[in-house]
Protein backbone atom coordinates (compact mmCIF):
# COMPACT_ATOMS: atom_id res chain seq x y z
CA UNK A 1 0.00 0.00 0.00
CA UNK A 2 1.40 3.38 -1.01
CA UNK A 3 -0.67 6.55 -0.68
CA UNK A 4 -0.02 9.65 -2.77
CA UNK A 5 2.51 11.94 -1.05
CA UNK A 6 0.23 14.98 -1.20
CA UNK A 7 -2.54 13.06 0.55
CA UNK A 8 -0.11 11.84 3.22
CA UNK A 9 1.13 15.39 3.80
CA UNK A 10 -2.41 16.72 4.11
CA UNK A 11 -3.40 13.95 6.51
CA UNK A 12 -0.33 13.92 8.76
CA UNK A 13 1.27 17.40 8.51
CA UNK A 14 -0.07 18.65 11.85
CA UNK A 15 0.84 15.44 13.66
CA UNK A 16 4.41 15.37 12.32
CA UNK A 17 4.89 19.09 13.00
CA UNK A 18 3.65 18.56 16.58
CA UNK A 19 6.17 15.76 17.15
CA UNK A 20 8.98 18.03 15.94
CA UNK A 21 7.76 20.95 18.04
CA UNK A 22 7.38 18.79 21.13
CA UNK A 23 10.92 17.48 20.86
CA UNK A 24 12.72 20.59 19.61
CA UNK A 25 10.59 23.38 21.06
CA UNK A 26 11.22 25.47 17.97
CA UNK A 27 8.71 25.91 15.12
CA UNK A 28 11.38 26.39 12.43
CA UNK A 29 13.09 23.14 13.39
CA UNK A 30 9.72 21.39 13.63
CA UNK A 31 8.96 22.53 10.07
CA UNK A 32 12.31 21.10 8.95
CA UNK A 33 11.44 17.79 10.61
CA UNK A 34 8.12 17.69 8.78
CA UNK A 35 9.67 18.51 5.41
CA UNK A 36 12.43 15.94 5.78
CA UNK A 37 9.95 13.30 6.96
CA UNK A 38 7.66 13.79 3.97
CA UNK A 39 10.59 13.91 1.57
CA UNK A 40 11.74 10.57 2.93
CA UNK A 41 8.22 9.17 2.48
CA UNK A 42 8.13 10.44 -1.11
CA UNK A 43 11.40 8.67 -1.97
CA UNK A 44 10.63 5.50 0.03
CA UNK A 45 10.31 2.58 -2.38
CA UNK A 46 8.67 -0.13 -0.28
CA UNK A 47 4.95 -0.58 0.26
CA UNK A 48 3.25 -0.28 3.63
CA UNK A 49 0.91 -2.86 5.14
CA UNK A 50 -1.75 -0.38 6.25
CA UNK A 51 -2.50 3.25 7.09
CA UNK A 52 -1.49 2.50 10.69
CA UNK A 53 1.87 1.27 9.38
CA UNK A 54 2.31 4.54 7.44
CA UNK A 55 1.41 6.57 10.52
CA UNK A 56 3.82 4.64 12.70
CA UNK A 57 6.61 4.88 10.10
CA UNK A 58 6.12 8.66 9.70
CA UNK A 59 6.22 9.16 13.47
CA UNK A 60 9.39 7.11 13.77
CA UNK A 61 11.09 9.05 10.96
CA UNK A 62 10.02 12.37 12.53
CA UNK A 63 11.39 11.36 15.93
CA UNK A 64 14.70 10.33 14.36
CA UNK A 65 14.93 13.54 12.32
CA UNK A 66 14.28 15.57 15.48
CA UNK A 67 16.99 13.65 17.32
CA UNK A 68 19.39 14.42 14.45
CA UNK A 69 18.68 18.13 14.82
CA UNK A 70 19.15 17.90 18.60
CA UNK A 71 22.62 16.44 18.05
CA UNK A 72 23.84 19.40 16.00
CA UNK A 73 26.51 21.47 17.73
CA UNK A 74 25.53 24.84 16.36
CA UNK A 75 22.26 26.67 16.53
CA UNK A 76 21.03 29.17 14.00
CA UNK A 77 18.78 32.14 14.73
CA UNK A 78 15.44 30.74 15.80
CA UNK A 79 11.91 31.94 16.29
CA UNK A 80 11.32 32.11 20.03
CA UNK A 81 8.74 29.85 21.61
CA UNK A 82 6.96 32.96 22.91
CA UNK A 83 6.58 34.35 19.38
CA UNK A 84 5.21 31.03 18.17
CA UNK A 85 2.84 30.74 21.13
CA UNK A 86 1.29 34.08 20.18
CA UNK A 87 0.08 32.51 16.91
CA UNK A 88 -1.79 29.59 18.52
CA UNK A 89 -5.45 30.16 19.41
CA UNK A 90 -6.38 28.56 22.74
CA UNK A 91 -9.99 28.12 23.88
CA UNK A 92 -9.20 28.61 27.56
CA UNK A 93 -6.26 30.12 29.47
CA UNK A 94 -5.67 26.72 31.11
CA UNK A 95 -5.10 25.15 27.68
CA UNK A 96 -2.30 27.59 26.95
CA UNK A 97 -0.80 27.11 30.39
CA UNK A 98 -0.87 23.32 30.01
CA UNK A 99 0.71 23.54 26.55
CA UNK A 100 3.48 25.78 27.90
CA UNK A 101 4.08 23.42 30.81
CA UNK A 102 4.35 20.41 28.47
CA UNK A 103 6.72 22.32 26.18
CA UNK A 104 8.88 23.27 29.19
CA UNK A 105 9.42 19.62 30.09
CA UNK A 106 12.70 18.00 29.06
CA UNK A 107 12.16 16.43 25.63
CA UNK A 108 12.40 12.86 26.99
CA UNK A 109 9.23 13.61 28.98
CA UNK A 110 7.41 15.91 26.57
CA UNK A 111 7.60 13.42 23.70
CA UNK A 112 5.99 10.60 25.72
CA UNK A 113 3.25 12.98 26.93
CA UNK A 114 2.65 14.09 23.36
CA UNK A 115 2.53 10.59 21.88
CA UNK A 116 0.35 9.21 24.69
CA UNK A 117 -2.18 12.00 25.16
CA UNK A 118 -2.23 13.85 21.85
CA UNK A 119 -1.52 11.04 19.38
CA UNK A 120 -3.24 8.23 21.34
CA UNK A 121 -0.29 5.86 21.13
CA UNK A 122 -0.22 2.95 23.55
CA UNK A 123 2.66 2.38 25.96
CA UNK A 124 3.83 -0.48 23.75
CA UNK A 125 3.75 1.67 20.59
CA UNK A 126 5.66 4.49 22.29
CA UNK A 127 8.27 2.01 23.49
CA UNK A 128 8.72 0.76 19.94
CA UNK A 129 8.91 4.29 18.49
CA UNK A 130 11.48 5.49 21.02
CA UNK A 131 13.39 2.20 21.28
CA UNK A 132 12.71 1.92 25.01
CA UNK A 133 11.19 -0.83 27.07
CA UNK A 134 7.61 -0.40 28.26
CA UNK A 135 8.72 0.08 31.86
CA UNK A 136 10.86 3.08 30.89
CA UNK A 137 7.94 4.64 29.03
CA UNK A 138 5.70 4.19 32.07
CA UNK A 139 8.32 5.78 34.32
CA UNK A 140 8.75 8.75 31.97
CA UNK A 141 4.99 9.24 31.76
CA UNK A 142 4.70 9.09 35.53
CA UNK A 143 7.55 11.55 36.09
CA UNK A 144 6.19 13.91 33.44
CA UNK A 145 2.74 13.83 35.04
CA UNK A 146 4.26 14.54 38.45
CA UNK A 147 6.26 17.51 37.12
CA UNK A 148 3.18 18.89 35.37
CA UNK A 149 1.07 18.39 38.48
CA UNK A 150 3.56 20.31 40.60
CA UNK A 151 3.96 23.10 38.04
CA UNK A 152 0.25 23.59 37.46
CA UNK A 153 -1.08 22.86 40.95
CA UNK A 154 -0.27 26.26 42.43
CA UNK A 155 -1.63 28.30 39.51
CA UNK A 156 -4.79 26.26 39.04
CA UNK A 157 -5.59 26.20 42.76
CA UNK A 158 -5.32 30.01 42.84
CA UNK A 159 -7.99 30.31 40.13
CA UNK A 160 -10.61 28.27 42.00
Predicted features along the sequence, with ranges:
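Internal acidic/polar
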Residues: 68, 75-102, 122
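A short, charge-rich alpha-helical start-of-domain segment used by transcription regulators
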Residues: 1-18, 31, 42
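Structural recognition of an alpha-helix C-terminal capping motif at a helix-to-coil junction
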Residues: 18, 32-39, 52-64
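C-terminal flanking helix
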Residues: 17, 38, 106, 110, ...
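A short pre-motif secondary-structure segment
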Residues: 112-116
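Arg/Lys-rich amphipathic alpha helix in sigma70-family domain 2
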Residues: 49, 60-81, 143
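DNA-recognition helix of helix-turn-helix
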Residues: 63, 67, 130-154
Amino acid sequence: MKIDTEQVIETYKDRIFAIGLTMLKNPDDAEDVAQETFLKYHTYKKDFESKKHIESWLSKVAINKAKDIQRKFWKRKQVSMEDYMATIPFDRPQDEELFQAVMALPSKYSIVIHLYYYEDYSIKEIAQQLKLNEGNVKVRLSRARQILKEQLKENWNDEE
